[in-house]
C-alpha cells in the first residue's frame, strides 16, 4: 500500500478503531492495486461502519481518501456487494 499520502483519520478514534479503519482502507487499496476478496472487503467495511456510523462522515472520508489516493471506497464496496464472493480488481 502506498505511503505517499495521508489517511483520513479522526484524532478522537482509539487505536483499535484506527486499526479497523486502516484495514478497510487497505482493502480498498488492494482492490485497485491488485485483487481483493469481496468477502474480506465487506467484512472490513462492516467493522469500519461500527466506527464511522454517519453517512455524512463516510462520504467525507471517501472524498478525502479519493483526493489523496485516487481510490474510491464507495466504488470498492459497490463492486464487492455486486459479486459477493471471490476476488475482484478495480485496477486501472
Swiss-Prot record:
<comment type="similarity">
    <text>Belongs to the UPF0223 family.</text>
</comment>
<dbReference type="InterPro" id="IPR023324">
    <property type="entry name" value="BH2638-like_sf"/>
</dbReference>
<protein>
    <recommendedName>
        <fullName>UPF0223 protein Sez_0908</fullName>
    </recommendedName>
</protein>
<dbReference type="InterPro" id="IPR007920">
    <property type="entry name" value="UPF0223"/>
</dbReference>
<dbReference type="Pfam" id="PF05256">
    <property type="entry name" value="UPF0223"/>
</dbReference>
